A protein has these predicted regions:
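Short amphipathic alpha-helical coupling segments at ligand-binding clamshell hinges
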Residues: 74, 212-219, 288-300, 308-311
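Extracytoplasmic ligand-binding site segments that recognize negatively charged/polar headgroups
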Residues: 61-76, 87-105, 109-242
Length: 363
């Protein structure tokens, strides 16, 4: 008798859990389908539907892994375009916000609408069910590599990594211009690299293949690289003359410091320009304000939003926006690390980086 009661109790709990899980899955599918259906409408009708429904929602929550001042520029422009919406922004580091998103999803406490962080997180977020597909028509304006086929990945910017050099210490004609130039013995002990530039190595391995890429990284690691943390700090140290060359400088840092009068210049690496992993705008699988979330994601992919980011020195996803003069990447080959390949192998990538370039834990 007791076993029968226990069995019925367990069966009831299992069935209740199944109902809750199914309801959650259905809600996520319903919100994704809701926006999918709206995205099939003619442009003017689509926009009107989003705006009318967003007015009732009144707010949108954005988890922002971005410079606060840069984020505020975007928020100000968005709220000016949609004065009936208030952006609730939570800024923080990408890792901390990722953990928050995952914790909220596990607790079924759905707080955020949109979230930007590095694309290497996509597999983690997909497996957790924390993001949904958003197949906005604004995806059509994005460069190759800034979106996926499914609709989870909608890239807003990436960071090209360049060779920054001190112009008082290095003549432009002698500055390294290619990956293989870095292996010249004259640069031994004179180059600097960030201790977390894992995407630089991923791009190298993606371009050359893992065998040749590993060989080049091993040789580069033998050049006695000076290791620091933080792209801004590294560029400042190069400008101060502490190091001759920074091999993984952020493009926007180089532009900003050069314009400010620092004694630096830079080269786009050949035969390819490595890029820090793409920054997409993810859509919550359970957005509290789905229509406002769609407007926010659209704005960040739109020419207006992308021009603001370009003004911050970002290499943006919009095909119609380029930098001016020598700061334009032009038709150079840019390699953005594959999130599908490295997302599940990121710990392995970190280990390779520490071993090959930083010479830690092995030779």
């Amino acid at each position: 008798m007791r076993m029968t009661i226990l069995f019925r109790w367990l069966a009831t709990l299992w069935f209740a859990g199944l109902i809750i899980f199914s309801a959650g899955q259905l809600a996520a599918q319903t919100e994704e389908k809701l926006l999918d259906d709206i995205n099939q409408l003619p442009e003017a009708e689509r926009q009107a539907r989003l705006v009318d429904s967003a007015k009732k929602e009144g707010t949108v929550t954005w988890y922002v892994a971005m410079n606060r001042a840069y984020a505020q520029d975007l928020i100000n422009a968005f709220e000016a375009q949609y004065p009936f919406l208030k952006v609730n922004a939570l800024t923080g580091g990408g890792g901390a916000l990722l953990n928050r998103v995952l914790a909220e999803h596990r607790a079924k406490s759905f707080q955020y609408d949109v979230f930007n962080t590095r694309s290497m997180t996509i597999n983690t977020l997909k497996k957790a069910g924390a993001i949904m597909r958003y197949r906005s028509p604004y995806r059509n304006s994005l460069r190759d590599g800034f979106y996926d086929k499914e609709g989870y990945l909608n890239g807003i910017f990436a960071t090209p990594l360049v060779f920054i050099f001190n112009t008082k210490l290095v003549n432009r004609k002698e500055a390294p211009a290619s990956i293989e130039d870095l292996l010249n013995l004259k640069w031994v002990g004179k180059m600097a690299v960030d201790d977390e530039s894992f995407d630089w190595l991923a791009a190298l391995l993606d371009y050359y293949g893992e065998a040749k890429g590993t060989e080049l990284a091993t040789k580069l690691g033998q050049q006695k690289l000076n290791v620091r943390r933080g792209p801004t700090l590294l560029t400042q140290l190069v400008a101060a003359g502490e190091f001759f060359v920074e091999i993984d400088g952020h493009h926007q840092e180089a532009i900003a410091k050069k314009k400010a009068g620092a004694p630096i210049d830079y080269n786009f690496p050949q035969p390819f320009v490595p890029a820090k992993s793409l920054i997409p705008i993810y859509m919550s699988s359970r957005p509290p304000h789905p229509h406002a979330a769609a407007l926010m994601a659209d704005f960040l992919m739109s020419k207006k939003g992308q021009e603001i980011m370009s003004g911050h020195g970002r290499w943006v996803g919009h095909k119609g926006i380029t930098a001016k003069g020598p700061d334009d990447i032009g038709d150079r080959k840019v390699v953005i690390p594959s999130p599908d390949k490295w997302g599940d192998r990121y710990q392995e990538l970190i280990g390779l980086y520490n071993k090959l370039l930083l010479r830690q834990g092995g030779s």
